[in-house]
């Protein structure tokens, strides 16, 4: 397995991004043959991810004061904003309507793969038990809004909202935090999970045991580029790692200082340095 150098990754990290409108233990990591990895949300994660692009417009998720939500479609040609429903007489306020989302989560996001829409509900960790105040969930829907599958993440798991969702070979890839309460103490584990679009099965794929946080920021070929946090001398240290999902190799690319940031744009990964310079 040829390792990619720091320079190679930072200069030529290719990813296909969804537009705004628009060591370690492994489970099942050796039978994957990926060569078309790409991002399906922005590298900044799920925050304010209310739109998903489409060839003729964009999908939008809008939440009401009741807590429930609907999917709308903004048509660029007709300049119309309509509920994603063929039932013109519907009030769009119950689960019989394909645009309706029943949710008690603390945040909703929407994204699109090649074949499906996904509604993502962001959970909130409880403070006193091994459950969530709100569960994280994933809804797989037809592009017309109809429900295909709906699953809740395990009760002690939340999406890492600062990381992107990636897709390839009919699977979604996303990072999670798994927490466990022991008396008054709490411990955390960090996993990469997959969701199979064909079978609807959610599976643990890779456990990050050498870092204390991991979030996807870019994807290309067989590689997921991760921004991670290490503990160095008891202090957190941000760094960039790569995970080869075909070989399960997880290797470090570089450290980041407190003043250095990464930004994904136009199929490249950019580094903003402390002297305010930007390098690809």
Regions found by a protein language model. Name each.
Residues 44-54, 95-111, 157-169, 210-221, ...:
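Repeated scaffold domains used in trafficking and secretory/extracellular systems
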Residues 20-23:
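C-terminal motif of bacterial Sec signal peptides marking the signal peptidase cleavage site
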Residues 113, 122-126:
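Active-site-adjacent structural elements in enzyme catalytic domains
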Residues 2-10:
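Bacterial N-terminal signal peptides that target proteins for export
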Residues 33-67:
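N-terminal export/targeting and maturation segments
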Residues 26-42, 67-94, 129-155, 183-208, ...:
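Surface-exposed loop/turn elements that mediate protein-protein interactions on large endomembrane-trafficking
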